Amino acid sequence: MHFTQREQDKLMIVVAAEVARRRKARGLKLNHPEALALISDELLEGARDGKTVAELMSYGRQILNKEDVMDGVEHMITDIEIEATFPDGTKLITVHHPIV
């Protein structure tokens, strides 16, 4: 099986997001890469489910809060930009200040 670089990147996000979900479920605070992966994966899946860019930009700010992440992580992630596949093509989703 051969994956393109883009497919490998998306698989890495999925794996990191699953680790983050398990750690969050155990009550652990997420670090920077875990928080970024979890939010990114939720946005990618929302796009595949048919949500609009506007809906995902709003939803991206509801996934995690300051209590879910280690100290300072909310300041490290000021914006998330991810290219997602929608039913009508690929679009860029930008979420400003995703952890509030």
Curated annotation (Swiss-Prot):
CDD domains: Urease_gamma. Transmembrane segments: none annotated. Its main location: cytoplasm. One of its GO terms (biological process) is urea catabolic process. GO terms for molecular function: nickel cation binding; urease activity. Pathway: Nitrogen metabolism; urea degradation; CO(2) and NH(3) from urea (urease route): step 1/1. It is found in: Cytoplasm. The keyword Hydrolase applies. Keywords: Cytoplasm, Hydrolase. It catalyses: urea + 2 H2O + H(+) = hydrogencarbonate + 2 NH4(+). The keyword Metal-binding does not apply. Its EC number is 3.5.1.5. Pfam families: Urease_gamma (PF00547). InterPro entries: Urease_gamma, Urease_gamma/gamma-beta_su, Urease_gamma_sf, Urease_subunit. Heterotrimer of UreA (gamma), UreB (beta) and UreC (alpha) subunits. Three heterotrimers associate to form the active enzyme. NCBIfam families: PRK13241.1, urease_gam. Belongs to the urease gamma subunit family. HAMAP family: Urease_gamma. This is Urease subunit gamma. It comes from Staphylococcus aureus (strain NCTC 8325 / PS 47).
